[in-house]
């Protein structure tokens, strides 16, 4: 039996420790650089849940200190807000048998309405200065918000001036659309009081209108950045018609609802161990491949592992190659064009298909990338869903 060989690859997850890969007895074995106890595992779980992806390399040096104090202020503000809300509810008559629902609702709407009006006026007067002095106005906003909550707590002690006080408080706290909605609500509330049928009818109407308006709003957005879906749409159209869609055309074709069609999943930024399990598979992954990423098919998914410093253009190339493989692996009739050849080679084995896909992507990608840039697509800032695993193999891993 062969002894342990020298490390041939290293692997990191975000800014955590490195793992080394060795060849042992014909197998790829991963060895941790240091023992990881339960404490470090819990710490890693905490980081992955509560800190940004790639922390601390993905954020500025002041991030942790700012987030600590921002969390403290948000927590204390939340408690203060709950106290002021309780006082406001008591002031409008919650728990008082003599208070009517309509009167309480109108008082609450007046409170919010004056707040939104104040917000509109403030944005009109000081809007251009907010970006210039963001830190100053952030602090001013918090102070005014605390003053408003104090006034709301104080208001029930002065029943005769309750509405006036909460309206003034609302000016400190709180846009034109919401204000218009409140004005309409002032008309609707007396009509729906003690009328459940009209209440449900109007609720259903406004809910449908809300969802329809949201759908149309999302549909109207045109994004020039590339995500996996838009890149897949662009690549398939290019392979079939030899043309690049404009951002407007591609965004109109992009689905906005979850797609439940059967697809071959694409996993970006996987561990090396998820892609290769033996020296033979490693050699197959490197065949015809001089790129800063490794790609293959494992357990019904197209898997891609990448180096640490991979240019954005190579990220696009990796995803394009993964899309080609994913399409070629779909059951059913073989696609037309260049992907048909890929499907034919796939009958000889998955790694043969991967090797052929390297040749395919080298032929089509330069002109495809030039076309993306010519049609206004951003190729330096991407929205591709890479996991944090980074692998260095070959000479770079020594």
Residue spans for each PLM region:
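Extended, charged interaction scaffolds in large complex subunits
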Residues: 2-9, 18-20, 198, 202-398
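Short acidic, glycine/proline-enriched loop segments that cap or flank alpha-helices
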Residues: 188-196
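Interhelical loop segments of eukaryotic multi-pass membrane proteins
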Residues: 89-107, 127-137, 141, 201-202, ...
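Transmembrane helix-loop junctions in multipass membrane proteins, especially transporters and channels
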Residues: 82, 86-94, 124-131, 157-161, ...
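Helix-loop boundary and gating motifs at the non-cytosolic
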Residues: 11, 19-119, 162
């Amino acid at each position: 039996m062969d002894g342990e060989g020298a490390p041939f690859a290293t692997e990191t997850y975000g800014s955590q420790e490195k793992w080394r890969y060795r060849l042992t007895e014909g197998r790829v074995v991963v060895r941790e650089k240091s023992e990881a106890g339960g404490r470090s595992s819990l710490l890693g779980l905490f980081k992955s849940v509560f800190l940004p992806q790639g922390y601390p390399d993905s954020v500025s040096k002041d991030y942790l200190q700012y987030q600590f104090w921002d969390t403290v202020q948000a927590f204390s503000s939340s408690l203060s807000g709950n106290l002021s809300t309780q006082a406001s509810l008591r002031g409008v008559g919650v728990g008082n048998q003599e208070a009517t629902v309509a009167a309480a609702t109108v008082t609450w709407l007046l409170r919010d309405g004056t707040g939104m009006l104040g917000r509109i006026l403030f944005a009109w007067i000081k809007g251009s200065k907010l970006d210039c002095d963001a830190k100053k106005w952030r602090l001013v906003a918090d102070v005014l918000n605390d003053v408003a909550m104090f006034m709301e707590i104080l208001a029930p002690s002065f029943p005769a001036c309750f509405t006036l006080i909460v309206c003034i408080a609302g000016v400190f706290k709180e846009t034109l659309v919401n204000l218009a909605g409140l004005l309409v609500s002032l008309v609707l509330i007396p009509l729906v009081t003690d009328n459940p049928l009209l209440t449900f009818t109007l609720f259903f109407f406004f809910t449908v209108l809300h969802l329809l308006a949201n759908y149309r709003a999302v549909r109207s957005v045109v994004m020039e950045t590339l995500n996996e879906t838009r890149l897949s749409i662009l690549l398939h159209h290019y392979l079939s018609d030899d043309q690049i869609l404009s951002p407007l055309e591609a965004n109109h074709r992009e689905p906005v609802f979850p797609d439940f069609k059967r697809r071959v999943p694409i996993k970006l930024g996987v561990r090396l161990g998820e892609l290769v399990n033996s020296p033979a598979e490693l050699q197959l992954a490197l065949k015809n491949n001089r790129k800063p990423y490794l790609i293959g098919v494992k357990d019904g998914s197209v898997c891609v592992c990448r180096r640490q410093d991979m240019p954005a253009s190579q990220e696009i190339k990796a995803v394009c190659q993964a899309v080609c493989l994913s399409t070629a692996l779909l059951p059913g009739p073989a696609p037309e064009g260049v992907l048909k050849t890929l499907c034919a080679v796939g009958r000889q084995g998955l790694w043969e298909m991967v090797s052929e896909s390297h040749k395919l992507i080298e032929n089509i990608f330069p002109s495809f990338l030039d076309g993306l840039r010519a049609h206004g697509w951003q190729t330096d800032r991407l929205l591709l869903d890479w996991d944090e695993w980074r692998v260095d193999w070959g000479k770079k891993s020594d």
